[in-house]
């Protein structure tokens, strides 16, 4: 196939025009402009002017010629090769028409080297006869960003390019051409100008990642997909091969078991396994250098790294280390750890291909053992599922098989271990036969009467003595013989005792203890089903009634009997002790209630009725009924109505009024006698004394009132330093008071120690200070205190008792006792 352009195409057009002139009377002229985009495709190479050789396909809607405005348009058609052009007319001939204001797309290669400005195409209007036309362009690349890429010569209409184009930035420019006359009037409609930038291979491929990571199981078959790498190229991959990327593997590390373990698809970049032999235990990871080349493998190249991780497959079976075990287990132990079995596995730790699963495959016919996997150590933990019996079987030989959680990837042998378990004999507790014994016993049997025999058996081979005791007997009704296990009545069995008997069953726990070292104890449960006897009479409820003495309504009493049928209902009733003179008792049809009613009038009062009830077993019960008769008609509900008597109200009100009057008088008297207490001392006189009148002999000594607030307030207000007006005191260290103890048991010592500290405290009252006594006036019988003496001489007085008053009176004791010089 050959594209025709230039002179060859022009010759072909001339041939067609010659044929047209032979059949059409009007002359036609043909011209050819190669830039107009007319494309002719001809098969063959011989282009003689007189003959068209090969097949001709006229592409497009026709050929546009711009010579003098005449247009010859040939539709799509063919001319058979070897025929004379004069005998091969086109399929259709259109009449000529004016040229159109159009321009086919302009293709401009990117990265052009110039020179610039470069002429691309020429705009030409057919309305330029007789007037001057001016051309202009608008659109992106002309008068809008990016501005200045294209311009047009105003008068000639040549479209100019001013700089290299970059297809990766802008693939296509859409401009509009305008034609106006000298006076500015538009002579043509705006024409669309498409400028398409054709690609050049100016970009290298780029991988989307520097390092790609993938994984594949070891031992997979060739052809298994591993991962996909991706590279991009900004060049055109649609119309050219510039952006078509081809992938390849440049290198592989390590090269084991050989250097071609993987392959990559040329177009998609998918990496696959090409050879067998992937073994994680030998090579856990491969590093591949992959290439991406544009031009479909013939252009620029870039590289990236692909890391292939080989995942573990269960291609290694676990192995026991060691393969034989021996263990000793006490009998009767449930859940006892017998042995831990250890295995090794070359697969990845803590993976399903590494975690072990154990199974007992032989030697455990009685299902006495179980084995589990330890979650951390992966060991098999063998434990007892049931208690082992030394007397039945003293040794067990178990066979344990190990596999993995994940199935084997390949066929592998399964490891088996042998565990020999020796059962150790222990002293077993006696066993009651049966463990829970149910018997019937009649209530009310005599004390000492045999109830049953409940014994136990010793499972040990040794002949040991068994003794029996009762561990739980809530009502203390039973006793057991320690040697024989005979159980007898120790109290009166009462089926109706709801505190101890539930649903007629009394439960007792019996113990059997052997003579082993150490002794062991077994338990048995004795369930006594107590049968009923007629030991309870019927009882009416309630036992108090209220009834009117006029047109009385019968009072219905319920009858209850703790015994069972046939020792209960139906009941019979009768009144005794002359109660039937005024009263009548009638039992209902069901026999479970009795109605009491008056036969004769009784005045309002309380009466006692003697009601005798008997059950179906003829057991009689006499009950006293308290009946309150009221003066009323019909039915009374709560109590007898009492008439209101107003004579009692007035005395009560009078008494209350008199009491209130008396209380008011007492209150006024107290307020009248109240005196305002005057302060004993003037504020400026800091005296702490009481004034006594010694001359009064009639009424005895009389204490004057004083203001207690003037005295010292105890330990809280003791001064830090006690001064004396006439003598400078000797300072003594203040004693340490013990704080209150938290333990109540120490409160005694706390009081004694703080009492001693208070006795020696110089800051405690009475203070050693100068006291000023009140002046008693002139002519006083005693001019001074020293004149008040009780004897003529101090020798007549005994001051030894002052020594017993403590440290605070030591000075006084020394003065009067002769211990200190005057």
From Swiss-Prot:
CDD domains xrefs: Cadherin_repeat
GO biological process: cell-cell adhesion; hair cycle process; homophilic cell adhesion via plasma membrane adhesion molecules; keratinization; negative regulation of timing of catagen; negative regulation of transforming growth factor beta receptor signaling pathway; positive regulation of canonical Wnt signaling pathway; positive regulation of gene expression
Pfam families from the UniProt entry: CADH_Y-type_LIR, Cadherin
Signal peptide span: 1-25
GO CC annotation: adherens junction; plasma membrane
Domain notes: Three calcium ions are usually bound at the interface of each cadherin domain and rigidify the connections, imparting a strong curvature to the full-length ectodomain.
Name the UniProt record assigns to this protein: Cadherin-3
Organism, as annotated: Mus musculus (Mouse)
